[in-house]
Amino acid sequence: MKRYQAYKDSGVSWIGEIPVDWSIKKLKYYTTTNDEVLTENTAPNYEFRYVDIGSVTLQNGIEHYQGFSFEDAPSRARRIVRTGDVIVSTVRTYLKAVASIQDDKDVIASTGFAVIRPKEVDSRFLAYSLANHYFVETVSSRSVGVSYPAINASEMVDIKNVLPPNDVQKCIADYLDRKTAAVDTAISDKEKLIQLLEEQRTSIICSAVTKGIDATIKMKDSGVE
């Protein structure tokens, strides 16, 4: 169901029609990329939380960190991130490793990520738009290589994306924050229920194989603890 009075063709096949007051722009025109890196002059004892490609999923964002000091860290641990940035994998793009940075304290990302920094866009809207299935698939489809597909950051930010007016970006981000929080809560509740059911299942099996299914039968000591 259409929610706006007038639409126009976006000119991008995977986007289709968009409201007339929305824009289609290449990512590089409203963001910056890979702005900050650790240099070789970094103090050897500088300690940080490292994010590698394998630490990130599209569904959960950053799932875990690895602690390193600069002198012991992998050579690819170089990209400085800030709160509001979005990291998108440029190598092994089939893994769809995309995450927004919520806490930037001593966090360093792998050079296998492009660090996308909002410039003329709401940071939350940017995070949602780059985690969009169609954008992620576009990145993957433009990657080169079979066993180790990769895309240059400069090519990634050349991809066109939807850019609504600023007030609409905020409204969309607010809406998605509420909806995703509700879904996350529902998932958590379901997981707790599943755990309880699994415990009940285990208990039923244990009871049946050790005591039988007749609750009225007289029991005796087995002699086994």
Where do the PLM segments sit?
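A short beta-sheet element
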Residues: 76-136, 140, 150-152
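Sequence-specific dsDNA recognition surfaces
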Residues: 10-11, 28-40, 51-83, 101
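Short coil/turn segments at secondary-structure boundaries
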Residues: 40-48, 141-143, 219-222
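Amphipathic alpha-helical segments
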Residues: 20-27, 126, 157-192, 198
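A short glycine-rich beta-alpha junction/loop motif
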Residues: 6-10, 90-94, 106-113, 144-170
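Short amphipathic coiled-coil heptad-repeat segments
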Residues: 1-18, 181-225
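Non-catalytic DNA-recognition/assembly elements of restriction-modification systems
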Residues: 7-40, 158, 162, 166, ...
